[in-house]
């Protein structure tokens, strides 16, 4: 299982973590250890541990925790969260344009739509989805003649 310190190291460029020296009045401008611990608790409730190989499990835990953390922070900033839009579908700058869409079957699914609300959730979903389709396990054994 991941730790707060491991999470901070993995996402050191992604989040403004609380520095060791800070003014008390600026404390809530940063991500606190308590915020990460809360998100880790949510991750534990959502993560299907048995689906992931040992080498991938920690990465899945990191991205699902980050997804939960972003959702928690957005919800705590009520006004900001109320105007959230889904990930980019298309944009143009001059003569250059890009577009993509999240397939409707994911957006319509109560199980999957939640993961499409942040980039971290999409990254986690990219790890999860292929492991939940056509997943086969074999069991060795024999029968008596």
What residue spans do the PLM features occupy?
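Short, hydrophobic/amphipathic alpha-helical patches that form generic packing surfaces
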Residues: 59-74
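A sequence-level detector of short, solvent-exposed, charge-rich linear segments
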Residues: 55-62, 80, 84
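Conserved short "hinge" loops at termini or chain/domain junctions
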Residues: 1-60, 117-145
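Short loop/turn elements at secondary-structure junctions
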Residues: 70-145
